[in-house]
């Protein structure tokens, strides 16, 4: 084998290996290190400069050379051992980390391991009609065989979408401010608090004062009791007649009570008042109650009571003073006249309001019919708005202009349901078609996901043949004030129905009583040529075009802040 050299100070060290022999043949190479690896190692020291360092005077001294040689031997041995140790350690670590992870020690008997249910079981627990209604950050609308799916933002072009999203978010935030949203976080009562206090139900009108019920102190005895109440939107006071040294901060946002008399403290707390100092609506003030390290908080709601809008049914409470029938017609005068005649057969004196956006106005000779004309083709929902805006009775019955009243069209039954329940709208059926559907909402940051399912939620208490649902057919009785509050979007001009119930979700409580049935006129073509021409024109407006569908999707995305529907 060859030799390899390296410099140490002013000396040259040459390491040679060749079997078990030294290759230099010099006396200095007579000391062997023994066998290592492939053979014995030989070290040769060659003085490079006799005049260098401490060896200048003894450059030829064997004793000094042997000592230095011995040191180098030790260094080489240490180096070899280090390399061997490093290789062994690497193999050991590799074996350790490549081996399976050891099992964690099992908990002691009787100790329950803390864990949540797997997602599959959570889905089963919190699913309704195939939809997982558990709080989560994002939602999605999955289409199925019976129900298609829509992603509403697809109604916009990709270049327009960023600006639309920005405007939509700004309008949504404005809506939230007006509605007092999001609601305040839940108040959590800490354990072992020394206070008694209201957790819900304290309300005050703007600029009014109310007593705060239920305040009490149940802490341990103390030389001096100090209790501090703090508000943020109003001021605090007490009706107790006590010195200012006992109660500080009357009429301020912070009220401090300090006394050594426990009974007096109880009396003062029983008569604490809250005053709204600003004209605000739908606000919640969180009042804190503190003593030493204990803190309790409770809400005070600031809002006006709802002003009622009542309809006088008259001393005899006749049906005509309770119900108005409303309809919208377009290019179907013959259908409208047949429907009106059927109404008069069963309800001769009920007021009927007709909104018409046909080209040619009709002449209707009926003292109980109010007929309103509109610009031609103004639209389906615009006509609905016009009709219900003229209703002056407690209830309004909506019908299509091609319906047919019969002996099973019992308006009184629907009135009885609304009078005895909290429903806002109750539908019947059209020739047995109930068309009940449920709307389920999942909320997320980018907009809610709307799920539509056919059917109903539950039976209606007190009316075994009726149910609670989200939407019904175009034959329904409704509280006039509620219907006017939700309204019909006039931008929906042609094909629209479910959109009204989507707008009313969260406002309208809807039911269905299929036993109340209205008929439908024949769909067979008419013989009269003029009427046939009108029907042909009507059908061109009736069709749902791709442009109209895209418009409705965009409307749901922006107006209703929906993300998708399925």
Curated annotation (Swiss-Prot):
Pathway: Protein modification; protein glycosylation; Glycolipid biosynthesis. One of its GO terms (molecular function) is acetylgalactosaminyltransferase activity. Changing residue 436 to R: Found in individuals with Sd(a-) phenotype; no effect on Sd(a) epitope biosynthesis. It catalyses: an N-acetyl-alpha-neuraminyl-(2->3)-beta-D-galactosyl derivative + UDP-N-acetyl-alpha-D-galactosamine = an N-acetyl-beta-D-galactosaminyl-(1->4)-[N-acetyl-alpha-neuraminyl-(2->3)]-beta-D-galactosyl derivative + UDP + H(+); a 3-O-{alpha-Neu5Ac-(2->3)-beta-D-Gal-(1->3)-[alpha-Neu5Ac-(2->6)]-alpha-D-GalNAc}-L-seryl-[protein] + UDP-N-acetyl-alpha-D-galactosamine = a 3-O-{[alpha-Neu5Ac-(2->3)]-beta-D-GalNAc-(1->4)-beta-D-Gal-(1->3)-[alpha-Neu5Ac-(2->6)]-alpha-D-GalNAc}-L-seryl-[protein] + UDP + H(+); a 3-O-{alpha-Neu5Ac-(2->3)-beta-D-Gal-(1->3)-[alpha-Neu5Ac-(2->6)]-alpha-D-GalNAc}-L-threonyl-[protein] + UDP-N-acetyl-alpha-D-galactosamine = a 3-O-{[alpha-Neu5Ac-(2->3)]-beta-D-GalNAc-(1->4)-beta-D-Gal-(1->3)-[alpha-Neu5Ac-(2->6)]-alpha-D-GalNAc}-L-threonyl-[protein] + UDP + H(+); a neolactoside IV(3)-alpha-NeuAc-nLc4Cer + UDP-N-acetyl-alpha-D-galactosamine = a neolactoside IV(4)-GalNAc,IV(3)-alpha-NeuAc-nLc4Cer + UDP + H(+). A motif (Vesicular targeting) lies at residues 9-15. The chain crosses the membrane at residues 68-88. Residues 1-22 are annotated as: ER exit and post-Golgi subcellular localization. It comes from the Eukaryota. Residues 1-67 are cytoplasmic. Residues 89-566 are lumenal. Belongs to the glycosyltransferase 2 family. This is Beta-1,4 N-acetylgalactosaminyltransferase 2. The gene is B4GALNT2.
